[in-house]
From Swiss-Prot:
Native organism taxonomy: Eukaryota, Metazoa, Ecdysozoa, Arthropoda, Hexapoda
One Gene Ontology term of the molecular function aspect: NADP binding
Primary residence: cytoplasm
Organism, as annotated: Sarcophaga bullata (Grey flesh fly)
Protein name, UniProt field: Glucose-6-phosphate 1-dehydrogenase
EC number: 1.1.1.49
Gene: ZW
One Gene Ontology term from the biological process aspect of the record: pentose-phosphate shunt, oxidative branch
Amino acid sequence: LWWLYRDNLLPKPTKFCGYARSKLTTADIRKACEKFMKVQPHEQQRYEEFWELNHYVSGSYDGRLGFEMLQQQMEIMENKGVANRVFYLALPPSVFNSVTVRIKEICLSKKGWNRVIIEKPFGRDDVTSKQLSDHLASLFDEEQIYRIDHYLG
């Protein structure tokens, strides 16, 4: 994301909000990422701007409270404007169903479009892949769903 932001390849204004079970802060994430970012001295100001656009919410994958906190954070970030939301799910397949249900119930943008990107193995086999596809189809329109499967092909 840093490289996309650095190179002006993201629409303006783009903001980022991470969500996971880990009890972290944005500062913790920044510190863990530093060695991978390859920031040049002349990019330092832009790098600081990038981190000002980042937020993080910690919560469970199956309860409502964390997703309600995520929704509140995204609303604060949007500042009452129209916002499109991209939910990028790099999760174990075992939690896809609960997470996507909570996103649908609680976290969708009411004023912009929504997209859900599913990364990782898309199921364990043909049967579980179809089950996941059917589940997603019950929640989202096909044009809202993007699948990235490292094992396809």
